[in-house]
Amino acid sequence: MVKQELIDRSPVRFLEKATNGGLQAGEIGILTSKKGLGKTSVLVQIGLDMLFQDKNVVHVSFNQQSDFVMTWYEDIFTEMAKKKNLTDASDVKADIVRKRVILNFNQDAFSASHVIKTLKALAEGGIKTDGLIIDGLETDKLNETAAAEFKSYAKEAGTI
């Protein structure tokens, strides 16, 4: 199987269909549930789907070490590659790692403007963010102002 088939058969296609084409640049989506129900797994699958489409992804984690998130990407990619008999899996994996940035922020010191400042610094350094995943941010920290800041950044940067 080639990478395009992974894109075509991704569960993200069902999400896109259910949401009339999925998120577009400048839009944000919020996924919430109780702790331990698989949000990170879903977000990593969304991230992998974007990476398979040669998009640059920044995964911001608030509740785990960066290596934990990297392990999620590794495990899900490995399982997909095995189940789908992905040709050139090591080349695809190397390409994914090059296009992915994982950042870790402290939940207690959360500031949307601090995260956005970091994303802008990455862009100034040549690391464009096509897709932004924010994982583990407690819902009481994501107030209307913070959500508006992220939406404004997404629109300005052309980020999903």
Protein language model regions, located:
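Charged, amphipathic alpha-helical linker segments immediately N-terminal to NTP-binding catalytic cores
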Residues: 1-3
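Pre-Walker A adenine-sensing motif
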Residues: 9-22
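Conserved catalytic network of the ASCE P-loop NTPase/AAA+ motor domain
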Residues: 21-23, 49-52, 94-97, 123-127, ...
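Pre-Walker A (Motif I) flank of P-loop NTPase domains
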Residues: 24-29, 55
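The conserved Walker
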Residues: 35
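Conserved glycine(s) of the Walker
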Residues: 38
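Conserved P-loop
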Residues: 41-107
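Phosphate-binding/switch loop-helix module in NTP-utilizing enzymes
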Residues: 100-159
